[in-house]
């Protein structure tokens, strides 16, 4: 029998390993379907496209909201500290938190994982976090893509991207034009740095020592605010909302109010956590 000179595996792409990962995802997904009983059909998992039944969401004048995002250079720290089981929570949070500030209830999520060389243990750990993030935000992971790309990424490097979809009634959409003079600004505490500003964080880390406890704070997962924001919107207690990401308080809050209004924030009322003091 003639030997094959060229193969995908020799070029750096392990299809057999990728198939094992797909089987793992399918197995975990089916368990999630049985637990939640809120999916189109557990037998359709593994198809070319992902299906989701929206008929159970009895929302008047429904509007679909979609968001996509990544985790940025926080990935470099996760790689450095060999901590992969919470970065998936970060990924879901970065997408879902953009949905809920418009009043949308998260419905489903899709992920994209790009790697230089597929490591089954590492990828399963990342996916564990993604499933956890979906659980925390009460949405379903219904699909995704894992791409092994030798030559684009070195063997231990990877990148993540997420895509989320939510639903909101047209009358319940939060936007800056709902804001009126004398409205009160409410702040919901963060869990730490979240997933922005890590190029600066890593630059500081190169020049300064950090304790083990604070090191753990650096990779603490981004908080998911679904329950808090959706509770407030259900009670009609908020007019607009802002997800504080790149640009910080100033840039993001200005996106949530009309041009003819200004904000007055008493920063002395905001408790500064240890990690921000270190920075």
How would you label these PLM feature ranges?
Residues 198-208:
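Short, compositionally biased
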Residues 91-102, 229, 275-279:
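Structured alpha-helical segments in the cores of large, soluble enzyme domains
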Residues 45-46, 51-55, 71-72, 82, ...:
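Glycine-rich anion-binding loops of enzyme active sites
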Residues 2-12, 21, 27, 122-137, ...:
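Glycine-/charge-enriched secondary-structure boundary and capping motifs
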Residues 2-100, 138-142, 150-151, 187:
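N-terminal glycine-rich phosphate/pyrophosphate-binding loops that anchor nucleotide-derived ligands
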Residues 57-59, 180, 228:
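Extracellular/periplasmic catalytic domains that process cell-envelope and extracellular macromolecules
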Residues 60, 74-76, 195-198, 252-253:
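Short helix/loop capping segments that flank catalytic or ligand/cofactor-binding pockets
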Residues 4-7, 72-78, 107-114, 206, ...:
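A short small-residue
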